[in-house]
Curated annotation (Swiss-Prot):
Annotated Polar residues bias: 384-397
InterPro entries per the UniProt record, alphabetical: PCSK9_ProteinaseK-like (IPR034193), Peptidase_S8/S53_dom (IPR000209), Peptidase_S8/S53_dom_sf (IPR036852), Peptidase_S8_Asp-AS (IPR023827), Peptidase_S8_His-AS (IPR022398), Peptidase_S8_Ser-AS (IPR023828), Peptidase_S8_subtilisin-like (IPR050131), Peptidase_S8_subtilisin-rel (IPR015500)
Source domain of life: Eukaryota
GO biological process, one term: proteolysis
Cellular component terms (Gene Ontology): extracellular region
All copies of domain Inhibitor I9, residue ranges: 36-113
Keyword annotations: Glycoprotein, Hydrolase, Protease, Secreted, Serine protease, Signal, Virulence, Zymogen
Residue span(s) of the pro-peptide: 20-117
Protein name (database record): Subtilisin-like protease 10
UniProt key word Secreted: yes
EC category: hydrolase
Keyword set includes Glycoprotein: yes
Record: glycosylation sites: N251, N392, N403
């Protein structure tokens, strides 16, 4: 997972009376982009007021540039989804002080950038994560999954892009938007790796789901928070405009110092009906003190290893009440650009397992399941298996309900194609289980093993998120053994909680409950 740290600038000139709350500096730890800001407006303003405010801000900017003979670009990205409205841009000190005083402005923060850290790349490790999802104990590499395989799901991978031509994606991956450069390629490998865990034919959880690349990181694994917000807004609006709500998922394997702007963008996507799977972070500290864990509503995922322990080696998984569930994230084999494969470790790899399982859940024919309740559903159907999860942290591990694991068995659907593409023959089944050739790890990504990762600042110093507090995660439940409802005859008997409508959005047992499962040999 990507988490960011850097150098902060002094904000002493931001002391205007009655101005919008400004993000506090973080004791010299942030890497701010000079003269770049993110502006959030109050939720109760109308769309017309938003447009008028942007015109006003542009006029203020133009007057200041003309008067002082300076060169600033002004408003860059803007967004308006539901009641979440704002913009980012490059402004002079005088202009941003004017903007902060405006009655419609709720929050202003400095844009920041950083570099990736806390994940490890190597070659030749076994792909154990899929097998763990469908078996009661670690060590089994057979992956049993329902044959719908996420065929109705649409997953937005907000990351460094996707190698959409990789044969493992079978034409199901497409480019959506690019907020970092003009090159629609994944030159950092991370996004393609995450996408492969979600939906590649050999390494993927949901082997038939559609994948949409939203690029917010450059070839050095860096990206401004304003690009994160713009990418989240684009994915939310794209899902709304194309009728994907109810089957749309966002994978967010990014993060860093706490940002109210990014947190609100994540929450807005979840409010819109998109399931958001977000990495908990790799600092071995409280996940709730940073972004994305500082956001409410979304599902925050920790990293477990192949022995069901919370990962505590290089880039140790974060912990705390804000971690909703654990998933495999250590030494995970998946796709990398150029048709190859490689292994990475981190909560970045854990979150895509949950995103893939959400795509399968979204593909259940006629279920009417609300993806907004998916995180609670996954937690309630999880296995209480994670050892030493950390203080005040759930021990729940993602499972899919096959082979006696506690969890739902899903239904059947057809493979999903990116919007505008016709279904092509021969894409209903995964290819050979052998990994593709060329298992080349990203250059320069082989840090010494078992080295302590840097911890995030103890005091992020951001303004509180005005739209809700992080909610506590599940407490350990040692008695939650799970497989008691698996029938020896090979059929499934649903658990007692199956028809609890208030907890799971009214999702009743569907007709296809006893459909056969497929077994994928790794």
């Amino acid at each position: 997972m990507f988490f960011f740290k850097g150098v902060v600038a002094v904000l002493s000139f931001f002391s205007a009376v009655n101005a919008a709350p400004f993000m506090k500096p973080n004791n010299g730890t942030r890497n701010y982009i000079p003269d770049s800001y993110i502006v959030l407006l109050k939720r109760d303003i109308s769309h017309d007021d938003f447009e008028l405010h942007k015109r006003w801000a542009s006029d203020v900017h133009k007057r200041d540039v003309a008067k002082r003979g300076i060169s600033f670009s002004g408003i860059g990205h803007s967004w308006a989804t539901g009641s979440f409205r704002g913009y980012s841009g490059v402004f002079s000190r005088d202009t941003i002080e004017e903007i902060m005083k405006h009655e419609h402005v709720a929050h202003v923060e400095r844009d920041q950038i950083g570099t990736s850290q806390g994940w490890v790349t190597q070659s030749g490790a076994p792909n154990w994560g899929l097998g763990r999802l469908s078996n009661n104990s670690p060590g089994n590499t057979d992956y049993t999954y329902d044959e719908n395989a996420g065929g109705n799901g649409v997953v937005y991978v907000i990351d460094s892009g996707i190698d959409t031509m990789h044969p493992e994606f079978q034409g199901r991956a497409t480019w959506g938007a690019n907020f970092i450069d003009k090159n629609n390629v994944d030159c950092w490998n991370h996004g393609t790796h995450c996408a492969g865990i979600i939906g590649s034919a050999t390494f993927g959880v949901a082997k038939l789901t559609a994948l949409i690349a939203v690029k917010v990181l450059d070839c050095n694994g860096q990206g401004p928070y304003s690009a994160f917000v713009a990418g989240l807004h684009w994915a939310t609006k794209h899902a709304q405009d194309n009728g994907f709500i109810g089957r749309a998922i966002i994978n967010f394997s990014l993060g860093g110092d706490n940002s109210p702007a990014v947190n609100q963008a994540l929450e807005e996507a979840q409010r819109a009906g998109i399931f958001v799977s977000a990495a908990a972070g790799n600092f071995g500290s409280d996940a709730g003190s940073i972004t994305p864990g500082g956001a409410g509503l979304i599902c925050v995922i920790g990293n477990s290893d192949d022995r069901d322990y919370r990962w505590t080696g290089q880039g140790p998984s974060n912990f705390g009440a804000r971690v909703d569930i654990f998933a495999p994230g250590t030494n995970i084999l998946s796709t990398i650009p150029g048709g190859g494969s490689g292994v990475m470790t981190g909560t970045s790899m854990a979150a895509p397992h949950v995103a893939g399982q959400a795509a399968i859940l979204a593909s259940i024919s006629g279920s009417g399941f609300d993806l907004g309740a998916a995180c609670a559903f996954f937690k309630n159907s999880a296995s209480a298996s994670v050892k030493n999860p950390g203080p005040n942290t759930t021990n729940k591990l993602l499972v899919n309900g096959a082979n006696g694991t506690k969890g739902p068995k899903q239904g059947e659907n057809k493979p999903n194609k990116p919007p505008g593409q016709d279904e092509q023959p021969g894409q209903n089944k995964p290819p050979s289980q052998n990994p593709p050739p060329g298992q080349n790890p990203p250059p320069g990504q082989n840090p010494p093993p078992e080295q302590p990762a840097p911890s995030p600042p103890a005091n992020p110093g951001d303004e509180p998120n005005p739209d809700g507090q992080p909610y506590p995660g599940d407490q350990p439940n040692p008695g939650d053994s799970g497989p008691s409802w698996w029938m020896p005859s090979g059929g499934l008997q649903p658990p007692a909680w199956w028809n609890r409508r208030p907890s799971f959005g009214g999702w009743n047992r569907p007709m296809w409950w006893n459909r056969p499962l497929s077994v994928w040999k790794l």
